[in-house]
């Protein structure tokens, strides 16, 4: 099994292996196999389109968790310039599961804040697997308040399996930190654009998810709980995660139908990890378009629309 591909992608992986083998043979034996390679590549693209046209909710969850999927820092490096990371919550610690700092989007200053996971074992431990402790949320709020002081828009990138549930986090009042962010973000007199780039789970996602616009990548998910957590509660078995994923309605298409997100950003064929540069360029265009729209509004209009938007959830 090719570990760069998920279980439902293995037919694609097998065909790609044949393409790679043909290329090796052509190069080593100086044979022109371009026509054969092109035919197989077209066949592989068709197979990929076929598989990805009918994904289940649980398969989308798998894509959102793909180990090669772009993380916040990958997008910061490709979308923004002059990024200057800011550290610490001024209460307890640095909190590396959330990163943030000043940057420029097409020359305009912005405050970028997002969850950051790790790829290697050491990075995963350092970033706490993208699960923020209270100090992470307090750092994020500190940066948002700083942005408000200088009338700088905030852009958040959401990618977390949830807020960290450890004893220390609870002792430092995890629930208060999340609630405080919801309360304060609702009142910030600056544009806020939130984008779910991977996992958007529970209060850990909401703590940097209150904004004027909510964007979502095509194969990200946004939910009150993970499918496995939901299945463990309702069916006492994580094996029912597939059923839970369908019931939760956590996909971009479903959330857009419900009016909980504003835009779905299409991903490259096979997912964002198949062409990170193209995905970043597309996300950049959506961010810029929404930012231009929001910056044309007064602070009072922003707040009024934000209040109406969030108070409308769950009414219909």
UniProtKB/Swiss-Prot annotation:
InterPro entries: Acetyl_CoA_COase_a_su, ClpP/crotonase-like_dom_sf, COA_CT_C. It is found in: Cytoplasm. Residues 39-293 form the CoA carboxyltransferase C-terminal domain. It comes from the Bacteria. GO terms for cellular component: acetyl-CoA carboxylase complex. Pfam families: ACCA. Keywords: ATP-binding, Cytoplasm, Fatty acid biosynthesis, Fatty acid metabolism, Lipid biosynthesis, Lipid metabolism, Nucleotide-binding, Transferase. One of its GO terms (molecular function) is carboxyl- or carbamoyltransferase activity. It catalyses: N(6)-carboxybiotinyl-L-lysyl-[protein] + acetyl-CoA = N(6)-biotinyl-L-lysyl-[protein] + malonyl-CoA. One of its GO terms (biological process) is malonyl-CoA biosynthetic process. Component of the acetyl coenzyme A carboxylase (ACC) complex. First, biotin carboxylase catalyzes the carboxylation of biotin on its carrier protein (BCCP) and then the CO(2) group is transferred by the carboxyltransferase to acetyl-CoA to form malonyl-CoA. This is Acetyl-coenzyme A carboxylase carboxyl transferase subunit alpha.
């Amino acid at each position: 099994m090719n570990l760069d591909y998920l279980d439902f992608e293995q037919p694609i992986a097998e065909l790609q292996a044949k393409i790679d083998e043909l290329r090796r043979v052509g190069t080593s034996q100086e044979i022109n196999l371009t026509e054969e390679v092109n035919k197989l590549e077209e066949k592989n693209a068709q197979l990929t389109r076929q598989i990805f046209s009918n994904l289940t909710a649980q398969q989308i969850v798998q894509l959102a968790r793909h180990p090669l999927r772009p993380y916040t820092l990958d997008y910061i490096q490709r979308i923004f310039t002059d990024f200057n990371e800011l550290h610490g919550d001024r209460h307890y610690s640095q909190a590396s599961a959330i990163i943030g700092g000043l940057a420029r989007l097409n020359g305009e200053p912005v405050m970028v804040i997002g969850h950051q996971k790790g790829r290697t074992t050491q990075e995963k431990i350092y970033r706490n697997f993208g699960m923020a402790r209270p100090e992470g949320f307090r750092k994020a709020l500190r940066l948002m308040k700083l942005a408000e002081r200088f009338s700088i828009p905030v852009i958040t990138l959401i990618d977390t399996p949830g807020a960290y549930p450890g004893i220390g986090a609870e002792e430092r009042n995890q629930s208060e930190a999340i609630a405080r962010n919801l309360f304060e973000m609702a009142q910030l007199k600056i544009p806020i654009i939130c984008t779910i780039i991977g996992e958007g789970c529970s209060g850990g996602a909401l703590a940097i998810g209150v904004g004027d616009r909510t964007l979502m990548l095509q194969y990200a998910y946004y939910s009150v709980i993970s499918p496995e957590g939901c299945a463990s509660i309702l069916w006492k078995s994580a094996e029912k995660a597939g059923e839970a994923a369908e019931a939760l309605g956590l996909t971009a298409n479903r959330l857009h139908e419900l009016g909980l997100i504003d835009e779905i950003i299409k991903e490259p064929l096979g997912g964002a990890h198949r062409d990170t540069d193209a995905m970043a360029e597309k996300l950049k265009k959506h961010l810029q378009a929404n930012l231009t729209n929001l910056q044309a509004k007064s602070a009072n209009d922003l707040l009024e629309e934000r209040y109406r938007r969030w108070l409308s959830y769950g009414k219909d």
